[in-house]
Design a protein with these regions (language model features):
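Glycine-rich, proline-tolerant flexible connector loops at the mouths of alpha/beta enzymes
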Residues: 34-59, 110-116
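Conserved beta-strand positions in the central sheet of alpha/beta enzyme cores
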Residues: 34, 67-69, 107, 140, ...
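A short acidic, helix-capping loop that chelates divalent metal ions and anchors anionic groups
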Residues: 39-43, 74-79, 112-116, 178-180, ...
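Active-site-proximal loop/turn and secondary-structure-junction residues that shape catalytic pockets
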Residues: 12-14, 37-39, 71-74, 107-114, ...
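N-terminal small/glycine-rich loop or linker at the start of catalytic domains
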Residues: 1-7, 66-78, 107
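Active-site acidic/histidine proton-transfer and metal-coordination neighborhood
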Residues: 17-20, 57-64, 76-169, 178, ...
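Flexible, glycine- and charge-enriched loops at secondary-structure boundaries
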Residues: 44-51, 80, 84, 88, ...
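Histidine-acidic metal/acid-base catalytic patches
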Residues: 1-7, 14-31, 55, 59, ...
Length: 264
């Protein structure tokens, strides 16, 4: 499959500095990065974070910023108005940096993740989406295991309530399966709201528990994912997310994943 639209998530290198992280991802054959939104990789709130260092490693290794895997939106459930405003400011600042560096999207979180809080967080996401449209950067809730992010119907509901094409879902088939949601039916539920895609693989073990594995060794049919997502009109990136350091070091594993994707 097309490798020109593949990126590498920096999450498996989250404890490493930016220079080492970009070195590994570049050496693995990637030209774009999905940068996790925590120190030392990224922050708009930590005064020690240096955007000039990010510029330096991008230029040094020729790896472009494709997506920021931020944690923006969590503060929309804060108990104080000032806390929610601070979260909104963080969201807008992150969108500004994404635009400045040419990233197409950012990952976001649906407040505290509970369905009961949806009505409280939607107004903040509406304002965020208006700003996102102005700067041309998409925002996506990543499928995790929460009441919203791990529930396809809730993902669709919050997307419809916000009502912006710049707000939607970061489709993550493997995370959905881990949460007990079948990834193909989930796609059908929220396919009109997909703004980004994460790629990793997994399978049920002998006890029926979902476990991650090397890309191509699991149950996720990524040819199906590619065909369906492309048919929906999606034209952005697919981020490989290597989270199997217990099987192989990321330093050698990412190159294998890129080759696996290319040969699918």
């Amino acid at each position: 499959m097309d490798v020109s639209r593949v990126t590498a998530c920096s999450f498996p290198l989250k404890e490493k500095d930016l220079d080492y992280t970009f070195q590994v991802i570049s050496a693995s054959g990637f030209e774009k990065i999905d940068l996790v939104g925590r120190m030392p990789h990224f922050s708009v709130t930590d005064p020690e974070y240096d955007l000039d260092e990010l510029r330096r490693v991008i230029d040094k290794y020729g790896v472009a910023l494709a997506n920021i895997g931020s944690y923006c939106g969590r503060g929309f459930s804060d108990g104080s108005k000032s806390g929610r405003q601070a979260a909104l400011d963080e969201m807008k600042q992150t969108l500004d940096v994404a635009k400045e560096f040419g990233a197409k999207s950012i990952r976001i979180f649906p407040g505290d993740g509970t369905r009961a809080s949806m009505g409280e967080v939607v107004p903040y996401f509406k304002e965020s989406a208006e700003y996102a449209e102005k700067v041309g950067v998409y925002m996506g809730i990543e499928n995790h295991g929460g009441e919203i992010s791990g529930n396809p119907e809730a993902c669709k509901e919050i997307s419809e309530k916000v009502g912006s094409r710049y707000f939607g879902i970061l489709y993550e088939p493997c995370n959905l399966m881990a949460a007990g949601a079948e990834y193909k039916s989930a796609f059908e539920t929220f396919k009109d709201h997909i703004v980004h895609v994460h790629v990793k693989d997994g399978r049920a073990n002998a006890e029926g528990k979902w476990e991650r594995c090397m890309l191509g060794d699991g149950e996720i049919d990524y040819q199906w994912v590619w065909q369906q997502v492309e048919a929906s009109g999606y034209d952005r990136d697919y981020a490989l997310e290597f989270e199997v350091g217990n099987i192989e070091p990321v330093e050698t594993g990412y190159k294998k994943w890129l080759n696996t994707w290319a040969n699918m």
